[in-house]
Structure formats: structure tokens, C-alpha cells
């Protein structure tokens, strides 16, 4: 599901809400998650999961086109860990 599809589904489930309000709400939630991660803080949504940053060590990679070694710097990457409720609901599928 894309962000656009999520917005369309929420609009269909809540016809009394203005489309712009739903769209702004989804965008605001995602923006706040990103801003919190930029500050190296963790975002926890109980039952759903948590977003955090994981550190990746510097390493030597390979250019897939040429096969040449490339030095990759250390970096932080976003990480999502599913919560208990989400894991249980997905396991039923």
C-alpha cells in the first residue's frame, strides 16, 4: 500500500472528514516520525511497533558494475521493529 492508497482508504472509511484534513494528517504523522528520527530519538506506537536508528559500521563494498572495491562510510539507517499486536495479526494470515 502506498501513501496515496492509504489516504484514499482513510477517506473512504471516514467520509465525514474533509479529504485535505486526512491527507494533511497522514503527512503530519510521517513527517513527525522522520523529525524524531533525525534527532536520534525512538518512536514507539504501542501494539504497532517502533522506529529507531541502527548504526552501520564502515566497510568495504563492491561496485556491482565494475567489481572495484569501494569504501563505504559509517552511517545510521532507519529500523522498524513490529510490536506484539502487529506480529500476532500478521501471523494469522
Curated annotation (Swiss-Prot):
Keyword annotations of the record: DNA recombination, DNA-binding, Transcription, Transcription regulation, Translation regulation
Q: Which InterPro entries match?
A: Hist_DNA-bd, Histone-like_DNA-bd_CS, IHF-like_DNA-bd_dom_sf, IHF_beta
Q: Which SMART domains match?
A: BHL (SM00411)
Which GO CC annotations does the UniProt entry carry? chromosome; cytosol
One GO term in the molecular function aspect is: structural constituent of chromatin
What is this protein's record name? Integration host factor subunit beta
Q: Which organism is it from?
A: Haemophilus ducreyi (strain 35000HP / ATCC 700724)
Record gene name: ihfB
The family database entries (Pfam families) matched by this protein are listed as: Bac_DNA_binding (PF00216)
Task: Name the SUPFAM superfamilies on file.
Answer: IHF-like DNA-binding proteins
Subunit text = Heterodimer of an alpha and a beta chain.
Q: Which NCBIfam families does the UniProt entry name for this protein?
A: hip (TIGR00988), PRK00199.1 (NF001222)
The alphabetized list of GO BP terms reads:
DNA recombination; regulation of DNA-templated transcription; regulation of translation
Protein role: This protein is one of the two subunits of integration host factor, a specific DNA-binding protein that functions in genetic recombination as well as in transcriptional and translational control.
**Positions of disulphide bridges:** none
Amino acid at each position: 500500500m502506498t501513501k496515496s492508497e492509504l489516504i484514499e482508504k482513510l477517506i473512504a472509511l471516514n467520509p465525514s472528514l474533509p479529504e485535505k484534513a486526512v491527507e494533511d494528517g497522514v503527512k503530519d504523522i510521517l513527517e513527525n516520525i522522520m523529525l524524531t528520527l533525525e534527532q536520534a530519538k525512538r518512536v514507539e506506537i504501542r501494539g504497532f511497533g517502533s522506529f529507531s536508528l541502527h548504526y552501520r559500521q564502515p566497510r568495504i563494498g563492491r561496485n556491482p558494475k565494475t567489481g572495484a572495491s569501494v569504501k563505504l562510510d559509517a552511517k545510521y539507517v532507519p529500523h522498524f521493529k513490529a510490536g506484539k499486536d502487529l506480529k500476532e495479526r500478521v501471523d494469522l494470515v
